[in-house]
């Protein structure tokens, strides 16, 4: 083991940049966090300022070391985990972005996606990239930038512009432009990457007219990519040695490294991943086949279902509807009523993700009667998170043939005991909440630490997977199915709301 005592995980999320310091026993020593601006130029469009992402992330790194009172030469390695799919294009020479980052939630490329469907690309994309055609993924976002920023496609062909997901952007900045890389997990979310040959897909690049010259080199999730002296006194060079997209990092942090193990992360959106080992399972039920990390950071595969609005729907109750003052209040108000009084909230504010994939669905509240009050709507909004999770799990079990015995959970909303109990009730499955909640950062730290020998193998980490609380189903099957049938009816009516007549 190295004499250096700590690993730093950088967790670049959708609404904030965070830095977490961990010791050899995977204890969290200190955390620093900075929020940044969400930019909404038009309805359904979402952007970030890449320079603000960099500024907030780099300052959290400086802050977290100061908070922990440790110097940079005590850091063995840095791991990075990031919001996936969010797309940045910048000038190689100056490091200046040519456009704002187009965020994963942004729906502006729905028309490009319609063209791909009309051109019969669905089967090819599913078979080779593991994905469905949706504005969510990076490929159509890159095309949009190249289509709309004058002269950019020609500049990209000349090697003057670079593309990256957020991990790539951060490493480029941290290494002063010396290293242009991504890892397999992030590459697998671009719709430009062949998950079987593990290389950029020439046909997808041709179809979307994206020059190969602008793409990063793709590497394993656990190896040394480069070094940085950011935040360090006296210029100590710290290896950057772990990268994984946030959901794959959480899967690894939960130590779901064996076939059939699954986790659900309750953040801005909800993301369920099931490790399928060395086998890429093709989904017949609207799920994604994606790349995950095996026990040493090598390529494994996973099935993934994405729910776009989870914590974001609670923020909507707080910020737009003013029904609660704080996200934590939602549990208190939800438990003031016995049920939702027949109300279902479908939070399809930006369309629906897995297994529906309908960018034209919109949010709706069904079952309103005169007796419905704010508490019923708050409760129904919380319940919608659990219903959407069941939608995904049903699809996952059908594709994999694996019946899940326990679901590991993480993310901000898992502190809500009402939601976790309802989740167990509506799934009819055990829900396991870990003691260490920072599993996304843990995953990045584990990947970075394994690469530099800070930890020798995962066996050293197994005892860290302590379950703080287990939730068990508390309702009958008939009641479960009755409630779920109501949800399915509500979803059906929220779909295709925005679709334009041909």
Swiss-Prot record:
Sites where the protein binds sn-glycerol 3-phosphate: 14, 84-85, 136, 246
Keywords for the protein's UniProt record, in alphabetical order: Allosteric enzyme, ATP-binding, Glycerol metabolism, Kinase, Metal-binding, Nucleotide-binding, Transferase, Zinc
Residues that bind ATP: 14-16, 268, 311, 315, 412
Residues that bind glycerol: 84-85, 136, 246-247
Cellular compartments per GO CC: cytosol
Pathway where it operates: Polyol metabolism; glycerol degradation via glycerol kinase pathway; sn-glycerol 3-phosphate from glycerol: step 1/1
Stored InterPro entries: ATPase_NBD (IPR043129), Carb_kinase_FGGY (IPR000577), Carb_kinase_FGGY_CS (IPR018483), FGGY_C (IPR018485), FGGY_N (IPR018484), Glycerol_kin (IPR005999)
Self-association and partners: Homotetramer and homodimer (in equilibrium). Heterodimer with EIIA-Glc. Binds 1 zinc ion per glycerol kinase EIIA-Glc dimer. The zinc ion is important for dimerization.
Its job: Key enzyme in the regulation of glycerol uptake and metabolism. Catalyzes the phosphorylation of glycerol to yield sn-glycerol 3-phosphate.
Recorded family membership: Belongs to the FGGY kinase family.
Name of the protein in question: Glycerol kinase
UniProt source species: Escherichia coli O6:H1 (strain CFT073 / ATCC 700928 / UPEC)
């Amino acid at each position: 083991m190295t004499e250096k005592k700590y690993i730093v995980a950088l967790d670049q999320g959708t609404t904030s940049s965070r830095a977490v310091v961990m010791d050899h026993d995977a204890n969290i020593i200190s955390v620093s966090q900075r929020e940044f601006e969400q930019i909404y130029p038009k309805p359904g469009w979402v952007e970030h300022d890449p320079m603000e992402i960099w500024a907030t992330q780099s300052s959290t790194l400086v802050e977290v070391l100061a908070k922990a009172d440790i110097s940079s030469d005590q850091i063995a390695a840095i791991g990075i985990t990031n919001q996936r799919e969010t797309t940045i294009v910048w000038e190689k020479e100056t490091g200046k972005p040519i456009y704002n980052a187009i965020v994963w939630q942004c729906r502006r490329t729905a028309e490009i996606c319609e063209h791909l469907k009309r051109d019969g690309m669905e089967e090819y994309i599913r078979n080779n990239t593991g994905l469905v055609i949706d504005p969510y993924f990076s490929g159509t976002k890159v095309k949009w930038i190249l289509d709309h920023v004058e002269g950019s496609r020609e500049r990209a062909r000349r090697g003057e512009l670079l593309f990256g997901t957020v991990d790539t952007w951060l490493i480029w900045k941290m290494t002063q432009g010396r290293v242009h890389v991504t890892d397999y997990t992030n590459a697998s979310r671009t719709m430009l990457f062949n998950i079987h040959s593990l290389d950029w897909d020439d046909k997808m690049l041709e179809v979307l007219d994206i020059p190969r010259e602008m793409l990063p080199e793709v590497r394993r999730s656990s190896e040394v990519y480069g070094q940085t002296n950011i935040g360090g006194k006296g210029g100590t060079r710290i290896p950057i040695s772990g990268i994984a997209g946030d959901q794959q990092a959480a899967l690894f942090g939960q130590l779901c490294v064996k076939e059939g193990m699954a986790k659900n992360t309750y953040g801005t959106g909800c993301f369920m991943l099931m490790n399928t080992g060395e086998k890429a399972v093709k989904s017949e039920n609207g799920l994604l086949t994606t790349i995950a990390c095996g026990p040493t950071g090598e390529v494994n595969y996973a099935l993934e279902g994405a729910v776009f609005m989870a914590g974001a729907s609670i923020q909507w109750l707080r910020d737009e509807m003013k029904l609660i003052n704080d996200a934590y209040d939602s549990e208190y108000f939800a438990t003031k009523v016995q049920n939702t009084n027949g109300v279902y909230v479908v939070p399809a504010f930006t369309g629906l993700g897995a297994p529906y994939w309908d960018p034209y669905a919109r949010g709706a509240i069904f079952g309103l009667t005169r007796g419905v009050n704010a508490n019923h709507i708050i409760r129904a909004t919380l319940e919608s998170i659990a219903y959407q999770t069941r939608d995904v799990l049903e699809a996952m079990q059908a594709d994999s043939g694996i019946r899940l015995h326990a679901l590991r959970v993480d993310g901000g909303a898992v502190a809500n005991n009402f939601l976790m109990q309802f989740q167990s009730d509506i799934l009819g499955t055990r829900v396991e909440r870990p003691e260490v909640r920072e599993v996304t950062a843990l995953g990045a730290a584990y990947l970075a630490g394994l690469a530099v020998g800070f930890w020798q193998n995962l066996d050293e980490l197994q005892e860290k997977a302590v379950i703080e609380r287990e939730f068990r189903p508390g309702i009958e099957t008939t009641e479960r199915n009755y409630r779920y049938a109501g949800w399915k009816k509500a979803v059906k009516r929220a779909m295709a709301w925005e679709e334009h007549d041909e």
